[in-house]
Design a protein with these regions (language model features):
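Polybasic, low-complexity binding patches
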Residues: 130-142, 150-173
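Short, cysteine/histidine-rich loop/knuckle motifs that typically chelate Zn2+
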Residues: 106-109, 147
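Histidine-centered nuclease catalytic patch
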Residues: 110-141
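Residues that form generic nucleotide/phosphate-binding pockets
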Residues: 53, 97, 163
């Protein structure tokens, strides 16, 4: 009699195919000069935006923020999470959050990039909803890196924060 052994689900390893990272469309424009921009310069540009200083840098940053906010608003409408559109984040709210957090991810404390060149850049800034049953509102959002935002999924934010802190402690020892 022939014996067939089937592997258990946990024994099956998934092969992750590394895709080539694509450049964002914006970087092909002549206005894109942010290939190696420092964190300090990004911080200065945010301050200039808040002070209503209009120059090429602030215009591009504001356009980038508006683009993300438009996407977040679309997500919220699709999931019917925003009842009052006045509660939705605006550019000024995002700029204040970026200053308050000093461009650091809420969870892993990594410096987030405002000007990034690759699609799905892991350390690009995102607006993370603390409670996923509500939309991208001022009282419900923090700045996080894309990596933490995607890996948290629907986990309770305090639990995820604790997990990240423990990982940082383990790395240091």
């Amino acid at each position: 009699m022939k014996k067939i052994i089937l592997p258990l689900e946990r024994e099956i390893k998934q092969v992750k195919i590394e895709r080539e990272k694509r450049d964002r469309k914006i970087i092909s424009s002549d206005n894109w000069i942010y290939h190696d921009i420092s964190q300090v310069r990004e911080y200065e540009i945010v301050k200039e935006c808040i002070q209503n200083i209009l120059n090429n840098d602030t215009k591009i940053l504001i356009r980038q923020i508006k683009g993300k906010l438009h996407s977040y608003k679309g997500q919220d409408k699709l999931k019917t999470l925003t009842e009052d559109e006045n509660e939705f984040m605006n550019v000024t709210d995002v700029l204040k959050l970026l200053l308050d957090c000093n461009h650091k991810c809420y969870y892993c404390k990594t410096n987030v990039k405002l000007f990034y060149e690759k699609v799905r850049e892991p350390i690009q800034w995102t607006l993370e909803r603390l409670d996923n049953s509500f939309g991208h509102n001022m009282n419900n959002c923090v700045i996080s890196c894309l990596k933490c935002n995607l890996s948290r999924r629907t986990m309770f934010h305090e639990r995820y924060t604790l997990t990240k802190q423990l990982q940082n402690i383990i790395k240091k020892t």
